[in-house]
Regions:
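A cross-family detector of function-defining hotspots
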Residues: 50-66, 113-130
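Post-signal-peptide N-terminal segment of Sec-exported extracytoplasmic proteins
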Residues: 29-70, 74, 78
């Protein structure tokens, strides 16, 4: 009996290591970098969080926060967002995207909204719209290309 309790406790542990030294761990919101917690407080006030995790390898760390409505935010080791996504067909919170990108999207795609934005280091941003079109922008928000 004691052996099965220990096995269940070990199986239920929140850290998972795999063969290439990657790990995934559930963590508390308070364990996120300050910058990430401030981002969540600013853009997702009152939102219910379903999961907070830390992932990476021995040399890199990243964090992810999942909300009960299906939204998700990924952060780098310093707490800077790297990917922000809303549930399918919904828009991410306003204010996250550079004004130049917002203006481009509203000017050229007035019926669409930004569903996801990914920071592409070092070149810029990939933006997915609710109409399923994907746009690429430079770091300063200059439009580069689109594809679907």
């Amino acid at each position: 009996m004691m052996m099965s309790v220990v096995a269940v406790m070990a199986w239920g542990c929140s850290t998972d290591h795999d063969s290439d030294d990657r790990y995934d761990a559930s963590i508390r919101l308070s364990e996120l970098p300050d910058t990430a917690r401030e981002f969540i407080a600013k853009y997702y006030p009152g939102a219910k969080i379903s999961h907070v995790g830390r992932k990476g390898t021995v040399t890199t760390t990243a964090y992810d926060v999942e909300f009960t409505d299906g939204a998700e935010v990924e952060f780098d080791a310093t707490g800077l967002w790297t990917d922000v996504s809303a549930p399918r067909g919904k828009a991410i919170p306003t204010g996250i995207v550079l004004p130049a990108i917002d203006q481009y999207v509203s000017g050229y795609y007035p019926g669409a909204a930004i569903n996801e934005i990914e920071r592409i280091i070092p070149s810029g941003y990939e933006v997915d719209l609710t109409n399923r079109l994907e746009l690429i922008f430079t770091q300063d928000g200059t439009f580069l290309s689109s594809y679907d």
